[in-house]
C-alpha cells in the first residue's frame, strides 16, 4: 500500500493508495504555477507522487490540485470530512476576495458556507481560483452575527428597534457635518448605486469613497490575483461612490479629525488601521452597518446589522469591466437586513421615494442612469457575465 494521509502543504493532504498516477497535479505545478513542488518518484509499481526535494505544496494556487484530481487522492484539509458532498447546495456566484472576479460555486450545508469551488470562465479565471479567495469565506461569513440594531445610550450600545435606529441615523447624519462615507468594496453595484444617492441626499459635499486596500503580488499570484482586494471597486466608483480624492486621502483626513460624522458600511476601519480609533472616538456621530460587532462598530453611535456577500443577489464589475452576477447561497439571520433595503428605507426617510422590489429593478435604473451600463440587461448577464458597453463612467 502507498502512503496514507501525507501532508503535502497547508491546504492539501495526499492519500497515495487512491492515486492512479495520472500526473495532473504534477503538470499543474509545472505548467500553470511553474513552482514544481510535485514529482513522480520511483519506478514501475513503486512509482508515487511526492514532494520534490523537500519542498512544500504552498504556492498561492495550491488547492487547485484537489479540484483536478480525478480520484480524490488529493483532499482539501479545510473541507476534509466536513460534510458529504452530495448534501451540498451549489450556487453560482463571484469570489469576493479581489477585483479579478473569479467565477465560483458557493457550496453550502444547513445554511452555512462549506466551501468555494472554481467555476469555469475562460474570460476571467479559466478553471482556477487562488487559495486566498478559496478560503476567504471563513473571515467574511464567520463569527457571531449582529441580529438587532443598536444605539448608544449612556456610554454603551443597547438593542433598539429598526424604526428607532433608522430615525437616529437620519437625524444624526442630516444634522452633523462634514460627513465621511465609506462603502465596502464587497457591496454590489446595486447597493453602491443606492448608497451614492443616499449620501448625496444627506450631504452633497460629503467625502464619499469605496474602501480599497492594495498589495504587492508575486509572479505566481499574478496568474490570477489582483493587487486590489475590493471585488467591486470599479463598479462602486462607476455608481458614483467617489468624491475623486481616493480612499487613502479620505482615511488620512479622517485620522486628522477633519470630519464630524461618518457612515461606514461593511468594513472594520480600526481593524485595518489602528490610528483611526482615536479619530472615530472623537466623531460627533458614527454609523456602522456590518455583519459583526467589529472594533469599528464598538465605537459607533448606531449599529445596523446587515447581510454578507453570500446572502445577497446583485452584480460586481471586475477590474477589466466585466459585469457578473452574485447569487444568494444562504439566508441571513433573522434581524439582519439587506444593505439595499436599509439604504432605501433611509432614502424614504429623507423624502426620496425609491421602491425597487429586486436587484434587477435597481440594475435597470443603473442601465438608464450610468453611461457605461447603458444597453446591459440584468436577465441577459447570465453565469459568464457581460462586458461594459463603454470604458466606464459615473452615475449621471
Predicted regions and their residues:
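N-terminal export/assembly segments and adjacent metallocofactor-ligating motifs
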Residues: 1-249, 256-264, 268, 346
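A generic structural signal for solvent-exposed, polar alpha-helical segments
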Residues: 134, 141-143, 315, 322, ...
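Acidic, Ser/Thr-rich low-complexity intrinsically disordered segments
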Residues: 376-393
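Non-catalytic alpha/beta scaffold blocks inside enzyme catalytic domains
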Residues: 174-176, 191-204, 208-376
Amino acid at each position: 500500500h502507498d502512503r496514507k494521509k501525507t501532508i503535502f502543504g497547508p491546504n492539501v493532504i495526499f492519500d497515495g493508495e487512491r492515486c492512479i498516477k495520472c500526473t495532473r497535479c504534477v503538470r499543474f505545478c509545472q505548467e500553470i504555477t511553474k513552482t514544481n513542488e510535485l514529482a513522480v518518484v520511483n519506478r514501475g509499481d513503486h512509482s508515487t507522487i511526492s514532494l520534490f526535494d523537500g519542498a512544500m505544496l504552498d504556492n498561492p494556487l495550491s488547492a487547485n490540485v484537489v479540484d483536478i484530481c480525478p480520484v480524490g487522492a488529493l483532499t482539501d484539509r479545510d473541507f476534509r470530512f466536513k460534510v458529504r458532498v452530495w448534501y451540498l447546495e451549489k450556487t453560482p456566484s463571484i469570489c469576493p476576495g479581489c477585483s479579478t472576479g473569479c467565477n465560483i460555486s458557493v457550496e453550502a450545508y444547513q445554511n452555512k458556507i462549506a466551501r468555494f469551488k472554481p467555476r469555469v470562465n475562460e474570460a476571467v479565471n479559466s478553471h482556477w481560483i487562488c487559495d486566498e479567495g478559496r478560503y476567504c469565506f471563513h473571515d467574511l461569513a464567520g463569527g457571531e452575527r449582529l441580529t438587532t440594531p443598536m444605539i448608544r445610550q449612556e456610554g454603551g450600545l443597547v438593542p433598539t428597534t429598526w424604526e428607532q435606529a433608522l430615525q437616529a441615523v437620519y437625524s444624526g447624519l442630516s444634522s452633523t457635518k462634514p460627513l465621511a462615507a465609506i462603502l465596502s468594496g464587497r457591496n454590489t453595484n446595486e447597493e453602491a448605486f443606492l448608497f451614492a444617492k443616499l449620501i448625496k441626499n444627506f450631504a452633497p459635499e460629503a467625502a464619499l469613497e469605496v474602501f480599497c486596500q492594495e498589495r504587492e503580488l508575486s509572479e505566481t499570484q499574478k496568474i490570477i490575483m489582483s493587487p486590489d482586494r475590493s471585488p467591486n471597486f470599479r463598479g462602486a466608483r462607476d455608481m458614483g461612490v467617489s468624491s475623486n480624492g481616493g480612499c487613502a486621502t479620505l482615511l488620512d483626513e479622517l485620522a486628522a479629525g477633519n470630519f464630524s460624522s461618518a457612515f461606514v458600511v461593511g468594513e472594520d476601519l480600526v481593524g485595518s488601521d489602528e490610528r483611526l480609533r482615536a479619530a472615530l472616538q472623537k466623531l460627533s456621530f458614527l454609523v456602522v452597518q456590518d455583519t459583526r460587532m467589529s472594533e469599528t462598530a464598538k465605537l459607533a453611535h448606531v449599529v445596523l446589522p446587515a447581510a454578507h456577500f453570500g446572502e445577497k443577489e446583485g452584480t460586481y464589475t471586475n477590474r477589466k469591466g466585466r459585469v457578473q452576477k452574485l447569487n444568494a447561497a444562504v439566508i441571513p439571520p433573522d434581524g439582519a437586513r439587506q444593505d439595499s433595503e436599509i439604504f432605501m428605507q433611509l432614502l424614504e426617510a429623507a423624502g426620496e421615494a425609491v421602491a425597487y422590489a429586486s436587484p434587477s429593478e435597481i440594475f435597470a435604473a443603473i442601465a438608464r442612469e450610468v453611461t457605461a451600463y447603458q444597453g446591459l440587461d440584468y436577465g441577459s448577464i447570465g453565469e459568464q457575465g457581460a462586458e461594459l458597453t463603454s470604458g466606464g463612467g459615473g452615475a449621471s
